[in-house]
């Protein structure tokens, strides 16, 4: 099936957006385009599936050879239980090059099937969504095929809502996290400490930076391209496989968080809470307790 002109998918070729969409599809890397073509040809034969849309980096035209495909499969509510049970089989029906897949409980999305196809190897996320719930979404995926406008109608019920960072939520947790990772450093659990620093970047620092810049993003995804100056600042929080480097990285993470918090509050006189004062003092004492007092000499 040709992805541009099949009567099976819902795009009206005389619609004004169709040439742009065709151009975007034509510009995809060969393996992404081939996978989409095979899936479009097959999805119309899957009982209970009534729509296929593509989201993620495709929406912004940012797919490159390293990108995955984020696909949404709309399911008739009555077929929902059976479709969930058959997700692995459906993944193989959509493209016979299916190698393996697992469900997305690790990211809080059990409707997701994380798949690997190939060769050539391609990561594809298949999100199976009941039409009853399809309006609840974080973005507007591009609909490639649907039955009787059902997915378009579902999306029209509500606007997408991207989960923005919540500075108050982060503040309520940051200092407890910082103390926990300080203890990991002092105990000598360096790899645990490095994991902790990664966590702070993904859950606190990068989300606040993206919030301040008005950019919708998850974790540190593509931060090098979207916020290059801040990405350079983040380098100070990476640490190394030794105690001194981890202490310096944690100190930098706290300093950077303080700057981001100040910007998020739109004022410079953010009063330190008791937990912040205690944890700051605790971290400031790390070099002395670890015999690193002369590290700057």
Where is each model-derived feature located?
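Hydrophobic alpha-helical segments and helix pairs
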Residues: 119-149
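Short aromatic-enriched loop/helix-cap "lid" or pocket-rim segments at secondary-structure transitions
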Residues: 64-67, 138-139
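Hydrophobic/anchoring residues in structured secondary elements
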Residues: 51-54, 128
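Hydrophobic C-terminal alpha-helix "anchor/cap" residues
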Residues: 40-44, 52, 200
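A short, charged helix-loop
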Residues: 138-169
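Metal-dependent nucleotidyltransferase catalytic core
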Residues: 18-47, 58-60, 66, 73-126
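Conserved nucleotidyltransferase catalytic core and NTase-mimicking acidic/glycine-rich helix/loop elements
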Residues: 2-4, 11-18, 158-297
């Amino acid at each position: 099936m040709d992805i541009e002109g099949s009567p099976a998918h819902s795009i009206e070729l005389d619609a004004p957006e169709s040439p742009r969409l065709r151009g975007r599809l034509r510009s995809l890397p060969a393996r992404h385009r081939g996978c989409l073509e095979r899936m479009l040809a097959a999805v119309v034969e899957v009982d209970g599936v009534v729509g296929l849309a593509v989201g993620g980096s495709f929406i912004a035209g940012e797919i490159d050879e390293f990108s995955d495909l984020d696909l949404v499969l709309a399911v008739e509510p009555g077929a929902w239980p059976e479709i969930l049970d058959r997700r692995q089989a459906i993944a193989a029906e959509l493209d016979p090059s299916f190698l393996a897949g697992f469900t997305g409980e690790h990211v809080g999305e059990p409707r997701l099937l994380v798949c690997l196809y190939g060769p050539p190897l391609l990561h594809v996320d298949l999100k199976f969504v009941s039409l009853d719930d399809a309006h609840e979404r974080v973005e507007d995926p591009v609909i490639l095929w649907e039955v009787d406008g059902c997915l378009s109608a579902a999306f029209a019920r509500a606007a997408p809502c991207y989960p923005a960072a919540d500075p108050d939520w982060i503040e309520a947790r940051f200092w407890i996290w910082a103390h926990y990772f300080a203890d990991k450093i002092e105990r000598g659990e360096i790899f645990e400490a490095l994991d902790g620093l990664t966590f702070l970047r993904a859950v606190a620092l990068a989300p606040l930076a993206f919030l301040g810049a008005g950019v919708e993003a998850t974790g540190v995804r593509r931060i090098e391209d979207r916020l290059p100056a801040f990405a350079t600042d983040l380098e100070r929080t990476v640490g190394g496989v030794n105690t001194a480097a981890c202490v310096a990285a944690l100190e930098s993470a706290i300093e950077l968080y303080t700057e981001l918090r100040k910007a998020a509050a739109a004022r410079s006189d953010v009063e330190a809470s008791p937990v912040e004062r205690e944890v700051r003092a605790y971290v400031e004492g790390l070099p002395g307790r670890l015999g690193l007092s002369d590290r700057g000499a």
